[in-house]
């Protein structure tokens, strides 16, 4: 059950790079042993040095890096990019979403998603995409609570 607090969302700035990098590493360590986690990290993880990767994201015109705070303390982040589709339409793709485990269930992730959806609507996007690992029902249920539904399933076989 989510207990709402006064979470605030703001645009990330260069002073947030250490928080973003630490959060990214914590998020990856949490999924590394989950089904599909190691390959997801290898395919989609940010390259080292992670701080430089986030700095590049801050400078990208169509990428939005958001910080979720509680009482002025950063506790989560979201990275999303407005991408051009072959049809000429745009979609907002969430590549990173992480909230510190001690700050989960209080509404920060929800506020990050609501802000991302506002940005997507403002950019004229036809939809918003995000990923959840197989078996990660908490993440899947979180995204479904915002109306996101599975539209594809990736399959893999290790060789």
Question: Which functions belong to the PLM regions below?
Answer:
Residues 3, 7, 11-15, 22-34, ...:
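Acetyl-CoA-dependent GNAT
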Residues 19, 93, 138:
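Amphipathic alpha-helical recognition patches that constitute DNA-binding helices
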Residues 89, 107, 138:
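Residues that form or flank phosphate/diphosphate-binding pockets in enzymes
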Residues 96-99, 105-118, 141, 145:
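Conserved acetyl-CoA-binding loop-helix of GNAT-fold acetyltransferases
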Residues 104, 129-139, 156-159:
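Conserved beta-strand-loop-alpha-helix junction that forms the acyl-donor binding cleft
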Residues 110, 122, 134-152:
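Conserved active-site alpha-helix within GNAT-family acetyltransferase domains
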Residues 120-131:
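Conserved GNAT acetyl-CoA-binding A-motif
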């Amino acid at each position: 059950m989510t207990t709402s607090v006064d979470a605030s969302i703001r645009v990330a700035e260069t002073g947030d790079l250490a928080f973003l990098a630490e959060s990214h590493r914590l998020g990856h360590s949490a999924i590394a042993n989950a089904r599909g986690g190691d390959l997801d990290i290898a395919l989609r993880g940010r390259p080292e040095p992670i701080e430089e990767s986030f700095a590049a994201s801050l400078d990208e015109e169509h990428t939005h890096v958001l910080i979720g705070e509680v009482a002025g303390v950063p506790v989560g982040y979201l990275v999303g990019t407005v991408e051009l589709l072959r049809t000429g339409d745009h979609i907002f793709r969430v590549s990173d979403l992480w909230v510190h485990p001690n700050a989960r269930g209080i509404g920060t992730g929800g506020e990050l998603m609501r802000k991302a959806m506002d940005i997507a609507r403002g950019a004229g996007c036809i939809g918003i995409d995000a990923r959840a690992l197989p078996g990660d029902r908490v993440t899947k249920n979180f995204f479904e609570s915002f109306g996101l539904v599975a539209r594809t399933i990736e399959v893999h076989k290790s060789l």
